[in-house]
Amino acid sequence: ARPVAQLNSLRFGDPKLDRTKWHVKGVVKGIGDYGNSFGVPVLAGEVFFDKTYNTNPLINAMSVGLVKKDRIISAVAKGVGNPVYIVGSSTGKDGIHGATFASANLTENSSEDLPSVQVGDPFMEKLLLEATLELNKSAAVIGMQDMGAAGIICSTSEMSEKGEHGMKIDLGKVPLRQKNMDPFEILLSESQERMLVVVEKGHEKEVERIFDKWDLNREIIGEVIEEDKLYFYVDDELVADVPASSLVLGGGAPVYDREYTKPAYIDEYKKFSIDDVPEPSNYLEVVMELINSPNIASKRWVVEQYDTMV
């Protein structure tokens, strides 16, 4: 789809804390720098502060795009022998275990366990966007998926399971930006601006012309197989094999029933009644107190850092 708008919902801790100020500055700058360079306007958003987020801020982002309903490309792998391409940025160690961290139980010590941060390149993303939109006009693409959380292992398993097929992948053919990467690091890397593309066999030159036009790295790293299984090699050495469905929610992936208890503060909140709040003697003081709250005060200082028109 052609992105036409970005939105965000940001949750930070106590604004008086230096750590929160650092979080706010970094997040707002990151959204502004990437979004403005990518060329998609930020049309709506919100910022909220609460001590609950002192250790771990919550950053929600959303993109809205337009695509013709008959040109939607699914994240699916099928067609035995069809080549599997990796396209876009080279692969590094950035973001490894990012998905693990996002799903972990967070404590006050969690900041010590932060994964390495993904290295974003909005200009590469722009090239990848234009190339995929051009690919969308051809009949050569069987399926396509971006590589976000858990990288190659996630994209290959989800596409294979959805298409009821498998893949043979040679990790030795994945373009790398760092030396001496272990196979598991290549599999789990969350380097941004990468796509996994399954192309109909015989159309390789057609899609490669498009990738080359947009000056994108592209490499055939494997092929689709009949068996519902993923095989990962480094050159000719098998380093991992697993059924695709075992890694996909709704397939064979384990589902955990976590223990939980009802927070005590919920019962305290239920006791609140507006009738118990005394009427103020000075409404002006109340208004001034309210508008001084960081959750009510103007967020103009944030909004003005984002492009709202492109």
Regions found by a protein language model. Name each.
Residues A1-V310:
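Glycine/proline-enriched, intrinsically flexible loops and inter-domain linkers
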